Amino acid sequence: MSPQTETKASVGFKAGVKDYKLTYYTPDYETKDTDILAAFRVTPQPGVPPEEAGAAVAAESSTGTWTTVWTDGLTSLDRYKGRCYHIEVVVGEENQYIAYVAYPLDLFEEGSVTNMFTSIVGNVFGFKALRALRLEDLRIPPSYSKTFQGPPHGIQVERDKLNKYGRPLLGCTIKPKLGLSAKNYGRAVYECLRGGLDFTKDDENVNSQPFMRWRDRFLFCAEAIYKAQAETGEIKGHYLNATAGTCEEMIKRAVFARELGVPIVMHDYLTGGFTANTSLAHYCRDNGLLLHIHRAMHAVIDRQKNHGMHFRVLAKALRMSGGDHIHAGTVVGKLEGEREMTLGFVDLLRDDYIEKDRSRGIFFTQDWVSMPGVIPVASGGIHVWHMPALTEIFGDDSVLQFGGGTLGHPWGNAPGAVANRVALEACVQARNEGRDLAREGNDIIREASKWSPELAAACEVWKEITFDFDPVDKPDIEAK
């Protein structure tokens, strides 16, 4: 009898409730190369042993329910059940444990992030035996990742499309994010692109509101792109947000963007949903559009240390679902992000093979095989004085996005773009000459500002602006 059809009917059925750990806690289990592995931060309720809590997570996110059922005998639970195979204490935290769970690959539909998350982070997060639960990391085996298309194009194809190499790309989110007419919005796009930026961007909540309908915005932004390209000789783009109330409307907007000949569209992948995002990513690959991803709503899921899901999991899911850019924090700006933890998931977005490194929050070695990489976008409260640190932290394969740091320039939008482009070129040149950006960054910016009045004005405006808050997202003590 094949494992798929093997049953346990001959064993007999015994009704009642039994501890999860009797079936789902298997410390002797040797994980398979095809298993999806998960690391959960578990906070059990008082009186619940960690082994029972870890087993409950494995059970409720795979084949288990609260009581034994007749139909258990109609399948092979040993083939399909999740297994909690290891538990470790979190040093420095009261009543917290890392529970490692292995899931057989047959539990998941091929090419569906939606189905994967419905199982792994579904009802189990409301389980009463747990005070809190957080998914820290996933190991996606190549046998599963190869069922996904992944990013529409990836880093190298994007650089070839833009004909831009050897430096980070520069962007700007148009502000105010809401309230501008389409024509005034397009004017701001033109001024920023003409000044030297590679991209401008719709904010995440710009969709199709009464003050600016999407079709009008697309038309004026396309006009701005073509005008700026003609004047600068560079390929330009604007992230046209195609996010909509239905998948059909979203694809309609992407089709219109393609007909206009613009290079890139945008999607809010968490509020829009993984099914919609994957559909849009497939359309973008088939039609030559780059896809920029915004992570609006992520902090609702990932901000708390003991409950929810770490952003590195959302980043892996996005790489599988599809996107060419994704916002990833700045380390130095106004948004949450500790350096090593941020670089941990940045590597998971960009690199082919990432080694386990608990000091950076990476619980498992991840092999993406041939899946294209995603460009991280640093955005949020950054300005010209941050340019050396951003260039040093994120490297060439990144987008550095200055919204207020462009549009807040005292001389206007185009001079703000000029200031950022001059600062970036100065940092890249200094790095290529062997200078230490971390140590000499301020001197590099000051030297460049002597030859650029636009940069000098920006330096004066933002010389004392800092965001000095202690990040929540830090590695555990034992992982250092």
Curated annotation (Swiss-Prot):
InterPro entries: RuBisCO, RuBisCo_large_chain_AS, RuBisCO_lsu_C, RuBisCO_lsu_C_sf, RuBisCO_lsu_fd_N, RuBisCO_lsu_N_sf, RuBisCO_lsuI. The active site is at residues 175, 294. The modification N6-carboxylysine is found at residue 201. The record marks 334 as: Transition state stabilizer. Its cofactor is Mg(2+). Its EC number is 4.1.1.39. GO terms for cellular component: chloroplast. The modification N-acetylproline is found at residue 3. The modification N6,N6,N6-trimethyllysine is found at residue 14. Keywords: Acetylation, Calvin cycle, Carbon dioxide fixation, Chloroplast, Disulfide bond, Lyase, Magnesium, Metal-binding, Methylation, Monooxygenase, Oxidoreductase, Photorespiration, Photosynthesis, Plastid. Belongs to the RuBisCO large chain family. Type I subfamily. RuBisCO catalyzes two reactions: the carboxylation of D-ribulose 1,5-bisphosphate, the primary event in carbon dioxide fixation, as well as the oxidative fragmentation of the pentose substrate in the photorespiration process. Both reactions occur simultaneously and in competition at the same active site. This is Ribulose bisphosphate carboxylase large chain. It comes from Phalaenopsis aphrodite subsp. formosana (Moth orchid). The lineage of its organism: Eukaryota, Viridiplantae, Streptophyta, Embryophyta, Tracheophyta.
